[in-house]
């Protein structure tokens, strides 16, 4: 990769490693190197079925006996899987993600999940 005249030129070898955000019918994805990364809560649905959610280690660790309105802060939200499990267990969850690309992927996953309700 060379920078010239305030533009970045990609050499052929750099193009194979380049990543980009792309939106398609399945939502927003980070695509590059023949792989894609997207938030998708549908794969977590079996884990929140009745009787299974209470056995999730994260939920068990976060529960506070006698707390009727639990609130969790997910300071490393990533794609939101932990937040999803806690919300399904009845927690109010505040999510924070420092990487704007990962935050955008998580926001897209949340928006798509809310559209399925």
Regions found by a protein language model. Name each.
Residues 54, 79-82, 102, 106:
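Amphipathic alpha-helical interface surfaces
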Residues 67-78, 94:
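Conserved class I S-adenosyl-L-methionine
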Residues 79-91:
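Conserved SAM-binding loop of SAM-dependent methyltransferases across substrates and taxa
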